C-alpha cells in the first residue's frame, strides 16, 4: 500500500482436521488477513485475523548485531598526553619519599575512578612506574590501559622513562604492559598511532610484580552492590514451550583484600507463566539437573549463590582459584582450579576439581526432595566429586575452542567440545556438545547434552561503555547426563582478555 504499510491476504486449503480434533483452535474460515505498519526499520506493528476465530496485534523487534541500537558508544574523552618539559628536573631519589608517592596516589585515584578504573597499586623508582589497576567500565582492555597510560604520563615526574600498566581482573594480574614514555608522547596524534604504539609496547607475565608492597592506600576493602529486574527463561517444555519468570535480583560483592572475593545473589520471583503442575522428570539417572523446575518455582526470596573466592598467582604462567559456599543455584561445596596460560600463547590448559552436594529446592540446606513421575517424596542427599582437564585455543578471526575431559555431576565420564565465534563488537555465538559413558537410551530424550551459547555486551545495547554481558545457554532439553557445575568467573575467561592474542585483537581502541 505504502512504503510503511503492507496488506497481506492468504487463502489456505488446509482444513486443520487434526488440530481442530485435538481442540487447539476452531477453524472457521480459510482466509487470513494481516496489516503491517513499519514504525521504524527495527520496529513493526501487525494487526491480524486468522482462521476466522482469532484476531490480535503483534509487535516485532528486529536487530542487526553489527549495528548497536544505542548508536555509537558514547565514551568519556580521554586526557591528552602532555609532553614533558625539557627543563623539568625531579630530585634524585624522589621515589623513596613516602609523601610524594602518597600524593601521586591521592591525585590519580579520583581521576581514574571517573574513567571507571580502580587504582590497586603503584610501584615507583626514579625511572620506572608500575600501576596495577582494575577496569570496571570498558569492554576493551586496551582502551582502559590507554586511559591509564595517558594519566600516568601526565602525572609522573620527568625522570620516569618507562610506564607499565598491570590490568587486574577479579584479583588476577594477567599481564604487564610496558611502554616507553617517549612513545606515548610521540604517537598519540599520528595516523598510525595505534600500530606504532603496539610496536613499541612489551607485554610480559605479571607474576613477578610485587603487588603487596606496592598496594595503594585505601584500595581495600571494596564493597559494591546492584539491584534491578531479572528475567529467567525455560524453553522447549512440551506443556509450556516458553516459561518466563520476571523477578528482582540483589547482587553484592565484598573484597576485603587483594584476590579475596565474597559474593552473593538474592532473587525474588514477582510474576511468571509457569504451569500449575510442574513436569516430573522420568530420568533413570540421578536427578542432577532435570529437577531444575522445582528450584525455579521456590517461594520467597531465594539465595542463588553465596561464595568466598581466593584467586592468586602460584607462579609464572600459572593462575589459581579456591572457592567455597553455595557455588550455584543447585550445588554447594568446595572447588579448586589451576590454569597454565603463557601471556603470549593462544593455548591454555586448566584443571578443575569440585566436591559438591545438591542444595534444597528453597536454597537453604542440602536436602532436596525426591522427585518421581508420581510426585515429590522424602528428602534425599546427593554429593559427588566432579572435575575436568580443559584445553583452550584461540584461532584467528575470533574463533575460540574449548575441550573438557573429565567427570560430570551424575558421576559419568566423558568429553565436551565447545566452539565460539567472537565479534569485534563483543557479541559471542557458539555451540557445544557433550558425550559421556551414559548410553543414549539411559540419557533419554535428546540422546546427549548439547546447546547454543550467546553472549551480548550491554555496551552494544545501551551505547555506553560497560563490562557487563548478558549470557544465555539454549538447550533443547535439560537432562542429567553430561551436566557440569555452573561456576562463574572461571580463570581462563578472566585471564585471556589481558593476554597478547586478545590485546592485539582489540589494540585499535588504545587511543580511544
Residue ranges and their predicted role:
Residues 1, 7-11, 22-39, 45, ...:
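Feature captures outer-membrane beta-barrel proteins of Gram-negative bacteria and organelles
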Residues 18, 22-24, 43-66, 79-80, ...:
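Outer-membrane beta-barrel translocator/channel fold
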Residues 24-28, 38, 50-52, 220-222, ...:
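Transmembrane beta-barrel outer-membrane domains
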Residues 68-69, 75-312, 376-381, 512:
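Outer-membrane beta-barrel initiation region
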Residues 71-77, 162-167, 263-267, 348-356, ...:
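A generic structural motif
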Residues 282, 286, 318-328, 333-334, ...:
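Extended amphipathic alpha-helical coiled-coil/heptad-repeat regions
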Residues 471-512:
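Intrinsic low-complexity, glycine/proline- and repeat-rich
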Amino acid at each position: 500500500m505504502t512504503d510503511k504499510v503492507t496488506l497481506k491476504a492468504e487463502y489456505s486449503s488446509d482444513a486443520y482436521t487434526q488440530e481442530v480434533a485435538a481442540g487447539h483452535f476452531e477453524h472457521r474460515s480459510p482466509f487470513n488477513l494481516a496489516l503491517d505498519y513499519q514504525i521504524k526499520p527495527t520496529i513493526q506493528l501487525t494487526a491480524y485475523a486468522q482462521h476466522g476465530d482469532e484476531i490480535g496485534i503483534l509487535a516485532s523487534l528486529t536487530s542487526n548485531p553489527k549495528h548497536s541500537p544505542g548508536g555509537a558508544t558514547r565514551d568519556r574523552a580521554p586526557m591528552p598526553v602532555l609532553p614533558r618539559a625539557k627543563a623539568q628536573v625531579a630530585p634524585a631519589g624522589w621515589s623513596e619519599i613516602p609523601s610524594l608517592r602518597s600524593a601521586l596516589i591521592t591525585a590519580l585515584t579520583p581521576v581514574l575512578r571517573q574513567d571507571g578504573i580502580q587504582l590497586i597499586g603503584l610501584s615507583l623508582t626514579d625511572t620506572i612506574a608500575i600501576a596495577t589497576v582494575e577496569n570496571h567500565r570498558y569492554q576493551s582492555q586496551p582502551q582502559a590501559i590507554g586511559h591509564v597510560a595517558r594519566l600516568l604520563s601526565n602525572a609522573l615526574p620527568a625522570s620516569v622513562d618507562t610506564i607499565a600498566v598491570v590490568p587486574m581482573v577479579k584479583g588476577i594480574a594477567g599481564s604487564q604492559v610496558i611502554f616507553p614514555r617517549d612513545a606515548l608522547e610521540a604517537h598519540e596524534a599520528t595516523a598510525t598511532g595505534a600500530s606504532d604504539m603496539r610496536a613499541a609496547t612489551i607485554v610480559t607475565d605479571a607474576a613477578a610484580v610485587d603487588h603487596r608492597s606496592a598496594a595503594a592506600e585505601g584500595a581495600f576493602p571494596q564493597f559494591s552492590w546492584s539491584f534491578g529486574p531479572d528475567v529467567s527463561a525455560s524453553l522447549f517444555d512440551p506443556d509450556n514451550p516458553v516459561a518466563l519468570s520476571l523477578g528482582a535480583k540483589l547482587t553484592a560483592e565484598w573484597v576485603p583484600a587483594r584476590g579475596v572475593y565474597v559474593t552473593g545473589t538474592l532473587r525474588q520471583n514477582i510474576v511468571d507463566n509457569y504451569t500449575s503442575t510442574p513436569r516430573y522428570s522420568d530420568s533413570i539417572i540421578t536427578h542432577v539437573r532435570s529437577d531444575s523446575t522445582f528450584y525455579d518455582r521456590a517461594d520467597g526470596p531465594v539465595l542463588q549463590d553465596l561464595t568466598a573466592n581466593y584467586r592468586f598467582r602460584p607462579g609464572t604462567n600459572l593462575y589459581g582459584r579456591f572457592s567455597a559456599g553455595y557455588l550455584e543455584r543447585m550445588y554447594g561445596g568446595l572447588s579448586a582450579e589451576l590454569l597454565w596460560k603463557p601471556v603470549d600463547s593462544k593455548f591454555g590448559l586448566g584443571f578443575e576439581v569440585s566436591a559438591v552436594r545438591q542444595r534444597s529446592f528453597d536454597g537453604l540446606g542440602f536436602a532436596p526432595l525426591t522427585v518421581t513421575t508420581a510426585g515429590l517424596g522424602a528428602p534425599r542427599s546427593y554429593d559427588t566429586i566432579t572435575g575436568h582437564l580443559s584445553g583452550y585455543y584461540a584461532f584467528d578471526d575470533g574463533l575460540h575452542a574449548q575441550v573438557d575431559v573429565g567427570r560430570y555431576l551424575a558421576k559419568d565420564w566423558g568429553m565436551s567440545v565447545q566452539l565460539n565465534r567472537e565479534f569485534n563488537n563483543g557479541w559471542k555465538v557458539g555451540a557445544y556438545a557433550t558425550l559421556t559413558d551414559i548410553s543414549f537410551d539411559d540419557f533419554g530424550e535428546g540422546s546427549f547434552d548439547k546447546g547454543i551459547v550467546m553472549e551480548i555486551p550491554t555496551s552494544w545495547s545501551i551505547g555506553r561503555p560497560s563490562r557487563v554481558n548478558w549470557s544465555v545457554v539454549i538447550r533443547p532439553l535439560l537432562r542429567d547426563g553430561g551436566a557440569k557445575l555452573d561456576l562463574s568467573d572461571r580463570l581462563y575467561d578472566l585471564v585471556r582478555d589481558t593476554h597478547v592474542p586478545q590485546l592485539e585483537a582489540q589494540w585499535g581502541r588504545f587511543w580511544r
